[in-house]
Amino acid sequence: MTKILNINSSVRIGDSISRKVTTEFINKWKAREADAIVVERDLAAQPLPHIDGSTLGAFFTPAEQRTPEQAQIATLSETLVRELFDADVIVIGAPMYNFSITSGLKAWIDHVARAGVTFKYTDKGPVGLLTGKKVYIFTASGGVYSEGPAQAMDFNATYLRTVLGFIGLTDVTIINSEGVAMGAEGVNKALAKTSNTINELLPA
């Protein structure tokens, strides 16, 4: 039984391209494996607090020494981390906002990328602790950034691949829905291409 963590980060709830394609992917997976468990983490419907000094203080204080306030702060991060460790497959909807990820997704990363929890430092360098999992990232962007002259401006997929790899999530497939700001034809073309990719990834 596969456990899937589905993370959506678009602030657009009703007409989001990234939400549309992650839903299509999840539905396709469920059609193949009806008993798969899907855990939803919606970073727009349930936004996470951005980390501050109090958050860092809680993270770096041993659990047995935390104040009640620090314990409460750390509980949220520990819940998010547990969702990652429990998942076999991680699906991330990651629209590009100003060449990078959404602030909500950055907040999630800051809560889960923690030294001694999801990665550790060794004498040979940092080692990610979230291993043996498959990640699918569904990006959406108004222009085309996976190739061509704008490729150097992609700090969305490239950043996610880097930071996820740092915590051990190295088996990453990125599916881009690009050119969605180029009118209805651009949207339809992007969605059709993504649907074809999903069918290739999850053949019937």
From Swiss-Prot:
Pfam families reported for this sequence: Flavodoxin_2 (PF02525)
Assigned keywords, A-Z: Flavoprotein, FMN, NAD, Oxidoreductase
Q: What's the catalysed reaction?
A: 2 a quinone + NADH + H(+) = 2 a 1,4-benzosemiquinone + NAD(+); N,N-dimethyl-1,4-phenylenediamine + anthranilate + 2 NAD(+) = 2-(4-dimethylaminophenyl)diazenylbenzoate + 2 NADH + 2 H(+)
Q: Which residues bind FMN?
A: 10, 16-18, 96-99
Q: Report which superkingdom the organism of origin falls in.
A: Bacteria
Record's function text: Quinone reductase that provides resistance to thiol-specific stress caused by electrophilic quinones.
Similarity-based family: Belongs to the azoreductase type 1 family.
Q: How does it assemble?
A: Homodimer.
Protein known as: FMN-dependent NADH:quinone oxidoreductase
This chain's source organism reads Herminiimonas arsenicoxydans
**Taxonomically, what lineage is the organism?**
Bacteria, Pseudomonadati, Pseudomonadota, Betaproteobacteria, Burkholderiales
